[in-house]
């Protein structure tokens, strides 16, 4: 990514996003930063700037392998760059109730992480795949789709959790 190449030689490169958000963060209740699944400099910037992190876990074969690496990265970020970083929760995504593998992943994640797992599960949905290709959020693309209702449910769950 071009931005990662630009940041490589910058001093305090891990804090660039945090510094950029400083002037606007009080204007919002939530600022969502969607990161690529890689653990590069942009993700490190996001974790350094964040108050909390939602960890998406696809209900697929290698999902739990990547989770371990991400949890280790979060621990490192907490230790070095952002001691206040919390894990908001684990979000199960791309769930298909017809597939045994999806159900097994849900069971494993819930068994090992219990209360850290959001009750909301994002089901596999064609509209969720189509929305980005039209440059739209799922809410703008099709607010009545199962994907939209899943994400609205997640938003309500997070708001309720943080209002207690």
Predicted regions and their residues:
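Generic alpha-helical secondary structure signal
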Residues: 16, 41-42, 69, 133, ...
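Conserved catalytic-core segment of NTP-binding enzymes
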Residues: 22-126
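C-terminal boundary of histidine-terminating zinc-finger modules
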Residues: 132-150
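Nucleotide phosphate-binding site architecture
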Residues: 123, 129, 139
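C-terminal alpha-helix
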Residues: 154-164
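P-loop/Walker-type NTP enzyme "switch/lid" segment
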Residues: 1-26, 81, 131-134
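Short, structured helix-loop boundary elements
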Residues: 14, 64-67, 148
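Acidic, proline/glycine-rich intrinsically disordered inter-domain spacer in sigma factors
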Residues: 5-8, 100, 139-143
